[in-house]
Amino acid sequence: MDRTDIAHLRRCIELARAARGGGHEPFGSLLVGTDGTVLQELTNTVGSGDVTGHPELALASWASRHLTPEACAGATLYTSCESCAMCAGGQYWAGIGRLVFALSGEQLADLAGGTTLRLSSREVFARGNVPIAVDGPCPELASDAASVFEGLWPSS
């Protein structure tokens, strides 16, 4: 993980804060192309009533509709918290070649008091035959990434 990765993760954490401020769960993600251009950035929209309104899944859907398979393979999905099994599956099927996250799913589960599905993105990707690189969690940003959840659950 390099400085550019960390800068993108910081933006994801900002997006997560914005999502929470808008009445949604605090998750933010962005998709970066092979040339380093930010292609899309999204926040969680579960508060609108759609439990699948995760930004990673929406970005995977966008990528599969707007990018070539080669562009997807060279793209990186950055997210404030490790993608859940649903979102990792979406990334796999879209063919997005790399995932980078600040906070791990296990760290999130500890904050949430165990209310999450404990299946890491690495485990999801390992079941497929298309390699997807995974970088995370980011110790440098763990505290900041966790802070967006303060007071959201009784254990946080």
Name each region found by the language model.
Residues 48-58, 62:
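A short, polar/charged loop-to-alpha-helix boundary motif
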Residues 1-18, 90-156:
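Zinc-dependent deaminase
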Residues 12, 16-19, 29, 40, ...:
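Small-residue (primarily alanine) positions within well-ordered alpha-helices
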Residues 69-81:
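Immediate flanking context of iron-sulfur cluster ligation sites
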Residues 81, 85-88:
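Conserved redox-active cysteine motifs that mediate thiol-disulfide chemistry
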Residues 39-46, 104:
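Short beta->alpha transition motifs characteristic of CBS
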Residues 22-26:
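Short, flexible loop/turn motifs enriched in small residues
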Residues 27-36:
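Short beta-strand scaffold segments in enzyme catalytic cores
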